[in-house]
């Protein structure tokens, strides 16, 4: 399983600390990759553009959370080859996460957390 940490220039320090927490829990450093906002031409081209979110018009900003949409590019980033854990840069490992892959099977290729019955995307496990 690869761990993909999404980030932008404002979140580099946090993402390095997150990576270190996964390494400390036994994930090899070569299994930790960064999804970089600054390297994504498509997302960068959308800065300043309008989009619809929850029924309201918003402007896409290059801000603290500009990396958010990178999470949906994780499977393509690893060429659809394996299971991946996609996390925000402020998510840290308190134990080795390898056992969570058991949430995925032939019927479930995506797992995430829920808050108040709503799916969250800060931590997503994907069978790419």
Question: Which residues does each PLM region occupy?
Answer:
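Glycosyltransferase catalytic domains, chiefly GT-A lineage
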Residues: 1-128
């Amino acid at each position: 399983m690869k761990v993909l940490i999404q980030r932008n220039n404002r979140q580099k320090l946090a993402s390095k600390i997150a990576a270190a927490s996964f390494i400390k829990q036994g994930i090899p450093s070569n299994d930790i990759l960064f999804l970089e906002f600054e390297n994504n031409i498509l997302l960068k081209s959308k800065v300043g553009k309008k989009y619809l979110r929850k029924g309201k018009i918003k402007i896409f900003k290059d801000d603290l959370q500009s990396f958010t949409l990178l999470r949906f590019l994780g499977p393509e980033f690893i060429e659809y080859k394996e299971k991946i854990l996609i996390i925000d840069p402020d998510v840290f490992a308190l134990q080795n996460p390898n056992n969570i892959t058991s949430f995925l099977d032939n019927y479930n290729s995506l797992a995430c957390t829920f808050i108040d019955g709503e799916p969250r995307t800060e931590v997503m496990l994907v069978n790419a």
